[in-house]
Amino acid sequence: MSGLLAALWLVGLFAAAPALRTSKNYGVADRLRDGLILGVAIPFVLGFVHLLYPAACWAALFLLAVLGYLRDAPRVPVRNGERPRYLLAGALIAVAWPQLMRPLLDGDSLSYHLPNAAAWVQAHSLWMTATHYWWYPPASELFAAGLYAVASPYALPWCGLGALALMGFRIASWSRTRLGAPPLLADALAAATITAFPLAIQGATLQNDVWLAAFWLETLYWLSCEPSNAAIVRCAALTALLKPQGFLLSAIALGTFKARPRVWLAASLALALWIAHDALLWHGGGAAIFSGAGYWESTIVAHGLPAIGEFLRVTLFASPFALLAFLAAFFGPLIERKSRALGWAAGCAALAFFVLPFGYATAVAQLATGASLRFAAPAMAVGAVLLARPARRVSGIATALLVASTLFGIGVIFQIFWNDGSTHVALPIALVAAGVAAAAHRWRAHWLVPIAGAAAIVLATHLAARHPLDYYTDSLRVGNTAPGIYRWIATQRPRAVGGWGVRLGVINVLSPATHTVDLPDSASCAYA
């Protein structure tokens, strides 16, 4: 039942997306963007007024779906739909399915992304300080909160896939319609981007680097192609609420393109609203902000050329295409001659990666392990777009290399999850996804895609819920000994649990009704 509710919610957001429609042509990327924005806006508004209840979420979605239908119905399609992105559709499922069919396993997702979302749902409000990171810019976690409120924690991996799909379809659309890339080249470019390891590994997590990259790319797209479109306002505002550096990237985009004052106002108001929220709660809530080296020491640039060399080595090993896309962004002002603003925005994003905190190390090595490559996601995304024009000159060779890169990226993900036999079905399911896209286009059966998507959500949620205890217990196993704490929580379902040095997200998955609280570092037992 929970899988069905998750499918209804996610497909419902897709159906309600035209409520935000602002252009005559409304492709897959546009619908994905607006669906994700609605998925953030519903819990954001309800949570601000202490109404974050399942019934309120469903009522809001129903009203928006009706509005979307009324706005969309009178419009006559200007063409027979978009050409299916066969490579992109298959690649998305190939890298995401091994993660979708499992409960959340990513460390950051379980440490603070999910605990934030769960705490809001449990409090029915955004006005809480039960977690260390309650102050964190909330956009992607709000999307997770909506799904957590109405459905199942085992459906949460789909939150990451939506952002990854938006990035892929926007790169394909931008390359094809605006930059003149041949259809297969545009498809292959998008597929190679979303299968690059730093991005693909977030395809079914609650991490927000791909979210930031996707919405920053959307902001750049509309600033570059239709600077008066109202979609810019929403994209810039949402970007400002993604990670602490979201507003910096928004400012880079708006500054390089000399955006209109209303766009600046929207991004500033969104951030100001959340800062006001934090200011009002700051006195009563502890906050975990940073641990490890100082700000400057945590950056890559502080460690000079050896650190930059390490970045090049680690990125090349993880994904050659990711390195190529990043370098394209870094040299954007030289590569992009027709839209100088786009080139400078890309270059600034690449430079920001080297000077932002956590790029080199925190309490643990970030760069040497490749963990910090995810912070370069915005630069990689726009760098992929910048590669479209040069790739046109050698279209056949470029397409072949991009397909090879796509297969390499899929192989990296498969290698990570291969020991679990269920991973082996990911490739056949990816082929089915491409087949569904082809059938829907050939027979003009547009209803086929949401039905297939709903079926996939139900199936993946069921598979993820089969034996979560095995995954989580193994994470604490020492030799042949495994503690029984997670099994006790799953069976006893206590009313509340205070945690210190533990990933509260595991408890949020195993016992959604259990209220979880991050205990302070000092006097934890007394506080509990």
Report each predicted region and the residues it spans.
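Short periplasmic/luminal acceptor-recognition loop of GT-C membrane glycosyltransferases, typified by
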Residues: T461-S524
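Perimembrane helix-loop-helix junctions
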Residues: R71-V76, C225, L249-A270, E336
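Membrane-interface alpha helices of multi-pass inner-membrane proteins
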Residues: I42-G47, A190, N229-P244, S250-G255
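Transmembrane-helix motifs of polytopic, lipid-linked glycan transferases
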Residues: A15-P18, A41, A65-R71, G146, ...
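Membrane-embedded, hydrophobic transmembrane alpha-helices
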Residues: M1-V78, L387, R392, G396-V432
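Hydrophobic, aromatic-rich transmembrane alpha-helices
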Residues: L13-A19, L164-S175, R313-L351, G383-P390, ...
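Transmembrane alpha-helical segments
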Residues: V95-A96, G246, L402-R442, L448-L476
